[in-house]
Amino acid sequence: MAIVSSARESLSHAMNNRFLPNLEYLLQGSILDSAVEHLMHRLKGLCDNVDTSPEPFHDLEVCMSLRQPNANQPLLLRVRRALGRDAPFQMRYLGNPEVDLRRPTLVRSCMDCACTNGILEFLTEMGFRLEFEYIAKGYMFRKGRMKITVSKLIKIVPGKQQDMANEPISQSYIVELSVVAPTGQENVGEEMRVFAEQLKPLVQLEKIDYKRLGGMP
């Protein structure tokens, strides 16, 4: 019981002092398939652990929505699971993006947690419905607290096994530069801007206003 109380006190202290990483700072871009190897080479030179290969990933991502009577937009939750390896499911809540002209990055509230493999059934029983799903396959790099992913998005073909889905959504890779940090660390955006400058002209990382585009990421 003492351990539980201590954990609760630590969590309460972290929340009261804004230590919890609850904001995602994000820049996004894309690069053609024909140029992605050049970007990978650049990232290997810029990022940590240059002597080792970047971390590969091959994940299924599912977006679930719950309609709320007094809200203009549904509640969206993302559930991601690794394909081909044993790992916990990951559930993520993303708030509406805030695009401030004074900030170099897009900012949105973010909460992540690990889940058991019954999370999709649980959400369905709560009233959530499937919005969309896709497979993301690529590589992840680290530079300090920054995370850089280079992903190929793959369409899930009805009637085929997930490992047989082989229809890319586009002839390009999605490139994302992100940091999840506590509230009040505005210097994060400047760090990301400086790093993004080093990837030009291979890829132009920008803050994308999804409200203007009429959709969510």
Swiss-Prot record:
Principal subcellular localization: nucleus
Keyword annotations: Activator, Nucleus, Transcription, Transcription regulation
Pfam families, A to Z: Med18
GO CC field: core mediator complex; mediator complex; nucleus
Signal peptide: none
Intracellular or extracellular location(s): Nucleus
BP GO annotations: positive regulation of transcription initiation by RNA polymerase II; regulation of transcription by RNA polymerase II
One Gene Ontology MF term: transcription coregulator activity
Keyword Transcription regulation: yes
Family: Belongs to the Mediator complex subunit 18 family.
Known function: Component of the Mediator complex, a coactivator involved in the regulated transcription of nearly all RNA polymerase II-dependent genes. Mediator functions as a bridge to convey information from gene-specific regulatory proteins to the basal RNA polymerase II transcription machinery. Mediator is recruited to promoters by direct interactions with regulatory proteins and serves as a scaffold for the assembly of a functional preinitiation complex with RNA polymerase II and the general transcription factors.
Subunit-structure text: Component of the Mediator complex, which includes at least CDK8, MED4, MED6, MED11, MED14, MED17, MED18, MED20, MED21, MED22, MED27, MED28, MED30 and MED31.
Name of the protein described by the UniProt record: Mediator of RNA polymerase II transcription subunit 18
Organism: Drosophila melanogaster
Higher taxonomy: Eukaryota, Metazoa, Ecdysozoa, Arthropoda, Hexapoda
GN (gene name): MED18
